[in-house]
Amino acid sequence: ELQEAQQPDVYVIIGTAHAGLEHLFAVTDKDFETPLGLVPTDQSIVQRLKALVPECMDEEIAHQSEHAIEFQLPFLQTSVSKPFTMVPILSSFSASSLTDPTVQHSVERFLTALRDTMTESGKTVCVIAAGELAHLGLRYGDKAPPTDFSFHRSMQRDLEMLKHVEELKPAEFAAYIQREQDQ
């Protein structure tokens, strides 16, 4: 479907910063290279974001040890039939932390700046939430190794959650995540 659709000029990829971030969002102006070639970062959008929210660049080093952005790139490189740029963003906050007014303000400030910057750019933009779904096993806090049952139950929950995204129901999506306590 993506190959047949009108394709955007820019892909804003928001991925998970597993080690956490002090400022909740980390943007980088570095290009990314995969075995399929170089994916350039959209410098004009990144520089505008930097002007509006300077601290978003403070932890760009976090990109060095993360994989959330890179996982999306080979898919885009093989599916998008025209040149494109990206805006790589790492984020680190939980749905439950949004009850903290300071966290909520920081998130709203960054997302407003991002939305305004995308609009002002005049470019067509696609936002990719490069979030990871369920993690199973002892290393993720489970009391036992995963079984076929736990795997399928987890997959059902992930699909339930994604149904709200597919149906463009952000309030239901947020409520689901809070109910599941970001698990």
Tell what function each PLM region has:
Residues E1-Q183:
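Active-site histidine-anchored catalytic micro-motif
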